[in-house]
C-alpha cells in the first residue's frame, strides 16, 4: 500500500511533571508525559531577549510507558519520536472536545538524555546496568552521530574511473 504522507514528530524537551501511568483492562500500560520545549529570540523593536514555552502531551504504550514511569521525573530531559493524533470526545456537559497528542507506539522512540536526577544512586541513569552509555549527538540539520562509532575516515584519493 502506498503511503500518502508523513506524520512524524521529533521533540527534545523537559518533563513538566512526573509521568502518569495507568493500566487498561487488557493489562497494557499507558503513560502520559507533559513535555516543555522552549524557543527564544531577540525582539527586533525592543532588543530584549524573549522566550516562549510550548507544552506537548505525549502518550506512551506498553514497556515504554513502564520505563518512563520508572526512570523519568519532573525536570528530566527526553528525546521523543512519535506521530500526531487528534482525539475527539463528548464531555459530561455534552460539549465536543478535541485534544492533539504525540503518540509513541510501534516505530516510535523515547530516550532519556543526560543523567538521572536521583543523586542517591551512582548509576548511569538506567538502573543498575554498568554498560557504557551510547549517547548520540544531534547536530542541527544533520543525522545523529554516535560517539561509539570509531570508524576511520574514508580515504577517497583514488582517481575517478572515467
Swiss-Prot record:
HAMAP family: SSB. One of its GO terms (cellular component) is nucleoid. Signal peptide: none annotated. Residues 6-111 form the SSB domain. This is Single-stranded DNA-binding protein. It comes from the Viruses. PROSITE patterns: SSB. CDD domains: SSB_OBF. One of its GO terms (molecular function) is single-stranded DNA binding. Keywords: DNA damage, DNA repair, DNA replication, DNA-binding. The gene is ssb. Residues 116-162 are annotated as: Disordered. It comes from Escherichia phage P1. This protein is essential for replication of the chromosomes and its single-stranded DNA phages. It is also involved in DNA recombination and repair. Residues 121-134 have a biased composition (Low complexity). PANTHER family: SINGLE-STRANDED DNA-BINDING PROTEIN. Transmembrane segments: none annotated. It holds the Pfam family SSB. Disulfide bonds: none annotated. One of its GO terms (biological process) is DNA repair.
